[in-house]
């Protein structure tokens, strides 16, 4: 689940396709990363009609082709679905990472994204694209990048249908990888201690 706001750039048609697939709700929300924000997308609805996502996944595959990647890795849940479509379009091996919550964690990013042990040897030494559905705070991509490096893979590019805010660019810079996205939207997230919605007393959505 993620969130978004007004469109900034990219193909207008692609922007509109994504907005139609994932209408935005406004309110006060807490996200997987632990950040707070004002907009929410029900990502569970993204693959309600897979045929609507496939052209976007194929467009993303075309952008990733030039990065000489040898495998695709997508974080469960919806990111892995996009990754599987991209891997199929490029005829590349596909792997995934799965969310695991650390109940002892008290700060941001309490969820890690390990790669199943049976898949790690298939990724070792390979140039890998991390493919996701939507990136906002970047919890899933952040965790997947860390897991790929631990198993000896070489992440070279992040691919996503859309980014919300600046976190995706910051992740790409931090990990020295490229970023390919079909659309970009304005969005702001806050740590709980500085959330202006909390300061105004706006209740969190359940």
Where are the predicted features?
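Active-site-facing substrate-recognition patch
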Residues: 2-68, 206
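Glycine/small-residue-rich loop that forms an oxyanion/phosphate-binding "nest" at active or ligand-binding sites
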Residues: 64, 78, 96-97
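A generic structural signal for well-ordered alpha-helical segments
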Residues: 64, 86-87, 148, 172
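Short glycine-rich phosphate-binding loop at a beta-alpha junction
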Residues: 69-76, 159
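Conserved acidic residues
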Residues: 70, 126, 156
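Short, well-ordered alpha-helical microsegments
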Residues: 79-83, 165-168
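Short, glycine/charge-rich flexible loops or terminal/linker lids adjacent to PRPP-binding catalytic cores
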Residues: 83-129, 136-142, 197
């Amino acid at each position: 689940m993620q969130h978004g706001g007004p469109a900034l750039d990219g193909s207008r048609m692609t922007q509109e396709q994504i907005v139609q697939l994932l209408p935005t709700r406004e309110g006060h929300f807490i996200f997987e990363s632990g950040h707070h924000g004002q907009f929410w997308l029900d990502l569970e609805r993204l693959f309600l009609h897979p045929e609507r996502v496939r052209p976007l996944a194929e467009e993303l595959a075309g952008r990733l082709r030039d990065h000489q990647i040898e495998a695709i890795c997508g974080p469960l849940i919806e990111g892995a679905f996009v990754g599987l479509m991209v891997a199929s379009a490029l005829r590349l091996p596909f792997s995934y990472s799965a969310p695991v919550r650390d109940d002892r964690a008290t700060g941001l990013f309490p969820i890690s994204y390990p790669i199943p042990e049976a898949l790690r040897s298939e990724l070792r030494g390979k140039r890998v694209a991390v493919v996701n559905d939507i990136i906002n705070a970047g919890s899933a991509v952040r965790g997947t990048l860390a897991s790929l490096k631990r198993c000896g893979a070489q992440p070279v590019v992040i691919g996503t249908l859309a980014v919300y805010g600046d976190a995706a660019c910051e992740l790409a810079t931090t990990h020295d990888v490229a970023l390919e996205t079909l659309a970009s939207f304005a969005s702001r997230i806050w740590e709980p201690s500085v959330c202006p919605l909390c300061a105004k007393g706006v209740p969190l959505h359940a």
